[in-house]
UniProtKB/Swiss-Prot annotation:
Protein name as catalogued: Dehydrodolichyl diphosphate synthase
EC number from the UniProt entry: 2.5.1.-
Listed Gene3D superfamilies: Decaprenyl diphosphate synthase-like
Family, similarity comment: Belongs to the UPP synthase family.
Keywords, sorted A to Z: Endoplasmic reticulum, Membrane, Transferase
Pfam families in UniProt: Prenyltransf (PF01255)
This protein's encoding gene: RER2
Function: Cis-prenyl transferase that adds multiple copies of isopentenyl pyrophosphate (IPP) to farnesyl pyrophosphate (FPP) to produce dehydrodolichyl diphosphate (Dedol-PP).
GO biological process, one term: protein glycosylation
GO cellular component terms listed in the entry, alphabetical order: endoplasmic reticulum membrane
Keyword Lipoprotein found: no
The organism of origin for this protein: Encephalitozoon cuniculi (strain GB-M1) (Microsporidian parasite)
Primary localization class, coarse: endoplasmic reticulum
Pathway(s) the chain acts in: Protein modification; protein glycosylation
Cellular location(s): Endoplasmic reticulum membrane
Amino acid sequence: MIEGLKVKALICVVEIIENGINSIHAMGILLFALNILKKASVLVSRILCAWNGKLSSEYPRDPRSRLGIFKNMNIAFICDGNRRYARKLGLEDSFIKDKGLQKIYEFIEFGCFYGIKEISFFCFALSNFKRSPEEVNKLMGLVKQKIERPKEIGIRPKFRVYGRLDLLEEDVRKRLMDIEEESKNNTSIIVNIFFAYSAEDEITRGIQFNSHVDILIRTSNTKRLSNFMIRQVAKGTSVFFAKALWPELTTAHLFLILLKHRLENKYLLG
């Protein structure tokens, strides 16, 4: 029954409330509407649990399905689980990390489609330098070879890079800085890349990232922040721990996570 439920049914619920909640005066009707929203939120939660790791990358692409429900949101990801996914499938880490990188572009496209204002990815922690030199070198090689320039993506994101770039090899640092420079006038969506980064280090060196974040999503069901977005969470950023590993997370997962957040925060808590 849960698997047969269409995402569009939930969108219809949101659309009804979006169009009518401001004009509802009868308290009984209002409570009824809020009860529907609460049940819809619970259904979204159940779908996320039932379909964890199994959702396709399909989501409503019809412009009429957008409704502006995610417009101007600021979302962030802790991209965790690449190595576990590689072990799970018996594949090379480098292949999986490439897949994980493509997942970033997939979510940037999703964000552009739904009018998300800002999207952040925690890709490489400062503490990751403690990993084996071989693993670190493979990741740096992936950055040099696979990160696409803004003009090659097909959309026009504005990239911002945060972290200790001074600790990176010169060619890796130049690659990241070039992407930031080339996209500085783009306006479709702001994409923040956190590389060689930790929140504690940022505070020590002076605050750089000050944007309010609506929701922080961490994959792999690891319930910790890993020194990321600490100030934002302390100031009210919602946190969602997804069971799916980073390469398993799909745009359908993301759609439902954001819809759940929207239902709860705009109508049930706000």
